[in-house]
Amino acid sequence: MIQPGAIVIVHLVNPTEKFFGVLQDLAVAGVTFRGINLSSFDDWMAQAVRPGDQTLGLSTVFVPLFRVERIFLDEPAGSVKSYSQRFAQVVGREVHEYLENPGGTPVL
């Protein structure tokens, strides 16, 4: 079962959207997560490398369950890296660590 705090990919319908983020709550009424549209992920990741240039960020969003098509854990698939792994490789910090302290120094 996917638990709050997990890094997830949320697929929505009407309109179709995909988000990367941290699951906060999954309930009968819907899903709450702190995330960013996947179309902005690479820009957000590039911005995380330059801490003084913060124009993109994750937003806390509630989506009614009728819009949720599926929720995936952000996991690697064979040789394809997860979004979290890509983030850590480019930024030098884990996603959870970055979200707790965006201006901190890289750990790598």
Give the location of each predicted region.
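Conserved RNA-binding domains used in RNP assembly and mRNA/RNA metabolism
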Residues: M1-L108
